[in-house]
């Protein structure tokens, strides 16, 4: 493999994408300096270290021709699968999930990198399996993509990490729909979503005379079931299952239009807000900087999505296009779920906000994904 950047690649560097990403990273570190202010451990310094490592990794990814990455998609995918399996034997358990490898003071979450592995492998499958005379996928051709998705989805789900499993599922579904599927499969998917909604309504919303085992509750872990209950009716148990959602909405709502000011947030300062440097980092931002700056942050995320889709539409091959769509889908669904969770529209799932939340594995995986977008854009006129 050759590591190089040629002069003719430079005009195709997506500077808008890079600026938007670095702007969100800078706002994230600034926000973490407030979320982790004394007397608590200041994590923003560690996040700066992780950012430095991540930027170095992005530069390395940009130096490699992404056609070599295409050839390595299967080994990358299999390596991540093996890491997920190894978690069952050597993983570190925290917050009820066996999701991390602990190496001294550092922890690594393989599921974060599995998301990239799934995107790369799906892109390779759709590139290699392309048939000009049959562009859309029926059930007989769809088994390969579904198998690629099912194995990591199941391994992450049994950790149990429902949030990350859902992110793998949603980003993969976006890629599969982008790859064109037959209309009857889309109709089946819509029916399945409606059926799932009916089941959840039956389990959690419809009043029943006495507690009873139901379809969803029987298969979910206790804390997962409590999160759904707390989402649907947070006021029913404000000190238990509804605590996270209630405190988060108080923080977001109290920020008003312009916010309370940096390090002036009461929910943050008094530590009422749980996981405020990770899952609920957007609540800190909303309380201290208000509605206007929340819009600024959303505009930056929107710019990342638009520039990323532009990379996909201008890619010179199917692999590059599918990788770009997969990366954008992965980031979009993660932002959608995290902010939806913070404002009470979606249940709490433990999903972090890309580039804003504290965490080395999360930041590195997102930046590697951005590196893939930059790589594809730089080489769109190379072959």
Q: Could you describe each region identified by the protein language model?
A:
Residues 1-5, 32, 333-383:
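A juxtamembrane structural motif centered on a specific transmembrane helix
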Residues 1-9, 64, 194:
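N-terminal secretory targeting signals
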Residues 167-168, 264-269, 300, 342-350, ...:
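Re-entrant/interfacial helical elements at transmembrane boundaries that shape
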């Amino acid at each position: 493999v050759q590591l190089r950047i040629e002069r003719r690649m430079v005009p195709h560097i997506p500077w808008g994408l890079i600026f938007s990403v670095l702007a969100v990273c800078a706002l994230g570190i600034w926000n973490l300096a407030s979320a982790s202010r004394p007397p608590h451990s200041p994590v923003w310094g560690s996040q700066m270290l992780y950012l430095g490592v991540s930027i170095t990794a992005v530069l390395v990814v940009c130096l490699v021709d992404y056609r070599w990455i295409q050839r390595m998609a299967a080994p990358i995918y299999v390596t991540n699968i093996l890491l997920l399996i190894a978690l069952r034997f050597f993983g570190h358990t925290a917050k009820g999930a066996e999701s991390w490898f602990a190496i001294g003071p550092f922890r690594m979450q393989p599921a974060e990198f599995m998301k990239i592995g799934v995107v790369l492998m799906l892109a390779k499958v759709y590139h290699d399996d392309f048939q000009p005379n049959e562009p859309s996928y029926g059930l007989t051709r769809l088994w390969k993509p579904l198998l690629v998705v099912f194995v990591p989805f199941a391994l992450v789900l049994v950790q149990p990490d429902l949030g990350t499993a859902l992110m793998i599922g949603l980003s993969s579904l976006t890629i599969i729909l982008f790859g064109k599927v037959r209309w009857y499969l889309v109709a089946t998917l819509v029916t399945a979503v409606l059926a799932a909604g009916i089941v959840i309504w039956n389990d959690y919303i419809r009043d029943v005379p006495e507690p009873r085992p139901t379809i969803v509750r029987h298969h979910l872990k206790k804390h997962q079931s409590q999160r759904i209950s707390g989402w649907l009716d947070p006021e029913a148990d404000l000190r238990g299952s509804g605590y996270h959602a209630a405190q988060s909405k108080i923080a977001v709502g109290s920020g008003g239009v312009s916010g309370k000011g940096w390090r002036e947030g009461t929910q943050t300062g008094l530590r009422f807000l749980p996981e405020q440097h990770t899952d609920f980092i957007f609540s800190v931002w909303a309380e201290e900087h208000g509605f206007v700056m929340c819009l600024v942050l959303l505009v930056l995320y929107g710019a990342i999505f638009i520039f990323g889709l532009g990379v996909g539409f201008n890619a010179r091959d199917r692999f590059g296009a599918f990788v770009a769509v997969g990366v954008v889908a992965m980031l979009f669904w993660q932002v959608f779920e995290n902010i939806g969770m913070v404002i009470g529209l979606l249940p709490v799932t433990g999903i972090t906000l890309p580039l804003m939340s504290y965490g080395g594995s999360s930041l590195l995986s997102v930046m590697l994904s951005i590196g893939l977008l930059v790589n594809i854009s730089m080489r769109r006129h190379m072959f």
